[in-house]
Amino acid sequence: MIESYLNLLIFVLLMVGTPGPANLLVMIGGARHGVLPCTGFILGLVSGKLCLNIVFGVGLGIFLTGQPMMLQVLKFVSAGYMVWLAAQSWNSSGGSASQNHQFRFKQGVIVHPLNPKAWVMTLLAWTQFAPELGTPTMQLLLVPLTFALVQLVFHTAWCAAGALMQRAIPQQQLLTRGLILLTIAVVVWALFQ
């Protein structure tokens, strides 16, 4: 079982650590507001993915992925939400003191349930790796907790990278707009995969 768990862990590290809509959004948050003000957003991202994993773990995900029309709607709603969330910082001129930023728990919690990349990685984790982890109870503990711990590390790191970039690039609005455009490009690319 240790080897099976290591396979899951490597998969999760690679999936969560690579650029995607959630990591780029949290990087924008870090660049705009710093790490500490985005803690709620990071916890929201982790909580949303935890819920998604539990839904898949109890079998509802397999049912939902068998509904192609629903998945198409999910993709477009997801893309629209992520573009909207990223674009909220387009004209923002405030730094970390900005009180009305959109990088809070309630915005973060719905990112992964609406994120097609999150659905694909969750489905793969449950179909390719979970069956080798023992009992359904063990699977329901290991898969969601592995994702949650890895997300806490990587989402915080992406947020910190955004904060560091903000310090290195004094033209904050230019940096923010560049990250927003990159996020939108990734979302549009993912939409047509």
Enumerate the predicted regions with their spans.
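Juxtamembrane transmembrane-helix termini in multi-pass membrane transport proteins
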Residues: 2-69, 124-143
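Hydrophobic/aromatic residues within the transmembrane alpha-helices of Major Facilitator Superfamily
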Residues: 13, 17, 50-51, 87, ...
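Hydrophobic alpha-helical transmembrane segments in multi-pass integral membrane proteins
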Residues: 53-58, 114-126, 183-193
